[in-house]
């Protein structure tokens, strides 16, 4: 994992990267983004996606780049109708019955080929000491978007569907699970050093459903990927899992666990004895001022001192975040490292 793995072996070095580190808060991103109207077209544009992936690395000198893409690239590549509408977000054809399987293609690699080209091109341009992260949405989260037709907070339609259509729901889940594993394997073949599975909506499920729709498919994906790339680190992020994080840790063969900002620091410390923990500064903190950023960051750094830890946010950088605050945060962590290594902090 290059820089990240080297950092973890050196207890004084804290690996840093941010979810949505390439995005709407950066003026250089906006300049490139405005050249393409359709968001999915932008994600599949090799030159433009490569450029915006590299922008935060140039600006902040982070330890990892994450490919600029979207979790809904996969269902789109599988033939599912996906659109991104301004001020609304993703809008999808709703999956309602068995007949909707006819719209899903078994082979997505042709359309995803540009994603793999982006990974290869970024890898060529990335500093040699910087890790490259590829990613996909979790089967449950991708499936939820397909069942809802758009992003929601409660996912009532999705949960009602799986309760009433258990066999069909499981068929859809298994299909997405298989395709997600293949997608991640091909990202690794293209040069990704680390892989991440984003489960944005795992927190809406009760325990039994969490086991069936989050834990089991995640295990299948990891095991399938590891059959081909046994040593590739995989980051899992069951956002909002709450008390079920512990069940997830116990039952999923985790390398790195990303946690949201609701997870107590004491739990992060405890879990870091079993897995590498990534997190978990509240993204809203970056909307404030340097004093608050320093205060909140120091608490996390002190709490995770000497632990298996990667610094990140509890979710993605918000669009209204001042870039200078991200720069301050990054420099503050580097200063903490330096002072800590000299035992004067």
Swiss-Prot record:
State which Enzyme Commission number(s) the record gives. 4.1.1.37
The alphabetical list of record keywords is: Cytoplasm, Decarboxylase, Lyase, Porphyrin biosynthesis
Instruction: Please state what class of enzyme this protein is.
Output: lyase
Task: Describe which pathway this protein belongs to, using the record's wording.
Answer: Porphyrin-containing compound metabolism; protoporphyrin-IX biosynthesis; coproporphyrinogen-III from 5-aminolevulinate: step 4/4
Which of this chain's residues are annotated to bind substrate? 20-24, 39, 70, 145, 200, 315
Identify the InterPro entries for this entry. UROD/MetE-like_sf, Uroporphyrinogen_deCO2ase_HemE, Uroporphyrinogen_deCOase
Subcellular location(s) per record: Cytoplasm
Q: Which reaction does it catalyse?
A: uroporphyrinogen III + 4 H(+) = coproporphyrinogen III + 4 CO2
- Provide the Gene Ontology terms for cellular component: cytosol
| Molecular function, one GO term | uroporphyrinogen decarboxylase activity
Query: Hey, which family's this protein in?
Result: Belongs to the uroporphyrinogen decarboxylase family.
Quaternary structure and interacting proteins, as annotated = Homodimer.
Q: What is this protein called?
A: Uroporphyrinogen decarboxylase
From which organism does this entry originate?
Rickettsia typhi (strain ATCC VR-144 / Wilmington)
Classification of source organism? Bacteria, Pseudomonadati, Pseudomonadota, Alphaproteobacteria, Rickettsiales
In the UniProt record, the gene name given for this protein reads hemE
């Amino acid at each position: 994992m290059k820089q990240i793995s080297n950092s973890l072996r050196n207890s004084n070095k804290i690996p840093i990267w941010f979810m949505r580190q390439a995005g709407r808060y950066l003026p250089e991103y906006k300049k490139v983004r405005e050249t393409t109207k359709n968001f999915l077209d932008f994600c599949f544009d090799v030159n433009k996606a490569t450029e915006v992936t590299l922008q935060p690395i140039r600006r902040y000198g982070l330890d990892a780049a994450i490919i600029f893409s979207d979790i809904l690239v996969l269902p789109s590549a599988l033939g599912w109708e996906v659109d991104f509408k301004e001020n609304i977000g993703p809008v999808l054809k709703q999956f309602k019955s068995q007949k909707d399987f006819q719209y899903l293609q078994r082979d997505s690699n042709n359309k995803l080929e540009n994603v793999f080209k982006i990974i290869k091109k970024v890898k060529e341009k990335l500093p040699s000491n910087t890790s490259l992260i590829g990613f996909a949405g979790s089967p449950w989260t991708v499936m939820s978007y397909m069942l809802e037709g758009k992003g929601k907070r409660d996912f009532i339609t999705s949960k009602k569907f799986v309760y009433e259509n258990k066999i069909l729901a499981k068929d859809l889940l298994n299909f997405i699970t298989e395709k997600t594993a293949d997608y991640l394997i091909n990202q690794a073949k293209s040069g990704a050093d680390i892989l991440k599975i984003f489960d944005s909506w795992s927190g809406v499920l009760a325990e039994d459903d969490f086991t069936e729709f989050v834990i089991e498919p995640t295990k299948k994906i990891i095991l399938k990927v590891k059959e081909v790339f046994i040593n590739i680190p995989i980051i899992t992020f069951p956002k909002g899992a709450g008390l079920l994080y512990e069940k997830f840790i116990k039952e999923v063969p985790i390398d790195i666990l990303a946690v949201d900002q609701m997870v107590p620091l004491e739990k992060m410390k405890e879990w870091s004895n079993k897995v590498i923990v990534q997190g978990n500064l509240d993204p809203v903190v970056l909307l404030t001022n340097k004093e608050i950023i320093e205060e909140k960051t120091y608490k996390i750094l002190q709490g995770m001192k000497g632990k298996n830890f990667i610094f990140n946010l509890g979710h993605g950088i918000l669009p209204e975040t001042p870039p200078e605050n991200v720069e301050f945060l990054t420099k503050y962590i580097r200063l903490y490292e330096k002072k800590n290594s000299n035992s004067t902090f």
